[in-house]
Amino acid sequence: MSRRGNIKRKPVPPDPIYNSCLLNMTIRRVMKSGKKSVAAGIVYDAMTMIKERTGEEPLEVFERAMKNLTPLVEVKARRVGGATYQVPMEVRPARGTTLALRWLIRYSRIRGGRSMASKLANEIMDAANETGAAMKKRDETHRMADANKAFAHYRY
């Protein structure tokens, strides 16, 4: 592990169409093999589908989905005297956003459907309505933290 100080994170520039940093982070996460234009097409198609299906502003639906998916607590393994405990820890906002995006895209990819854009749109709409596989993962993470509340005093 590095003994140097914390690195400064570069600010993520907003995307050109919706002017949202969160959407640009999503495009970067969807991207495979450096094909950013393909990833942007997928994300923007998904946003168009959300607008058609819900009639709401797609960015609002997306932000609501991200707010719902962001975990408040998670468990981290901590070794104490030969035993490993799952210690519940609060999640920093940046990590919470990263986890929410990771889960959203992972469960979009394994979801059934024709195109990645439609799978992503469906997962975003489900998350906005507090259903779907990504929400299930968030709830499971919260349950794990709740079950291991007894080890909270091992925080570091």
From Swiss-Prot:
One of the primary rRNA binding proteins, it binds directly to 16S rRNA where it nucleates assembly of the head domain of the 30S subunit. Is located at the subunit interface close to the decoding center, probably blocks exit of the E-site tRNA. Keywords: Ribonucleoprotein, Ribosomal protein, RNA-binding, rRNA-binding, tRNA-binding. Transmembrane segments: none annotated. This is Small ribosomal subunit protein uS7. NCBIfam families: rpsG_bact. Pfam families: Ribosomal_S7 (PF00177). Signal peptide: none annotated. It comes from the Bacteria. It comes from Crocosphaera subtropica (strain ATCC 51142 / BH68) (Cyanothece sp. (strain ATCC 51142)). InterPro entries: Ribosomal_uS7 (IPR000235), Ribosomal_uS7_bac/org-type (IPR005717), Ribosomal_uS7_CS (IPR020606), Ribosomal_uS7_dom (IPR023798), Ribosomal_uS7_dom_sf (IPR036823). Coiled coil: none annotated. GO terms for molecular function: rRNA binding; structural constituent of ribosome; tRNA binding.
